[in-house]
């Protein structure tokens, strides 16, 4: 039985075709036949009102940013995502690295992490925002994003592939599923259920929290989750969530751990929405 059993409604049924192709051990998913699903509520009433404020506000629109603002957004987003992982680069050092290719005398892995994040973020931004495209968030996109984020940081055999061994998450007693079949089954469920969330903010939170909790890869799971969250927002022409404040990094972690341990979205959803509202009000 999967460690995720408590998160799945009793009426959820997922049938898998075991004869489906499984090329490359774990990269191509078996076909899933979804019999019935019940949608979990992500936002409470107050959060729904905040979400509507964000969706209706012109300052939330990604397409209204100028090219220099786009670059600044990419830098601060990468700094934010890296800092959550314990990256030691300061904001100034991150900016020098990503804009001017000036490397600080710090760990190679820290610079590589930030460059991978930046290149992936910019690539998605250009495809969606500049190219006026929608990025389909499916397993192929997820594997591609993870591979781009983790290149040079994990082995080639584990970059862009589902993990085949157990992982632990610091700061929580929650243990992600260990069995490849359970990981694969839950991932198919997550990617299917996202379609039920027509509110792009809810969809972004749903994808972020559930992919992070599943930990489908050997490393880089939260980075991948934040990138997928951002892609879901970009698809809706919404500026992704970011912060450079230490207190926000702490609140992000608290919100995610609360979801790991209880399945309750409210703490992370509150953080996510409040960051969007604060950013809008700061520049109004």
Spans of model-derived segments:
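FIC/Doc superfamily catalytic core
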Residues: 11, 16-284
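Single conserved hydrophobic/aromatic residue that forms the stacking wall/gate
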Residues: 1-12
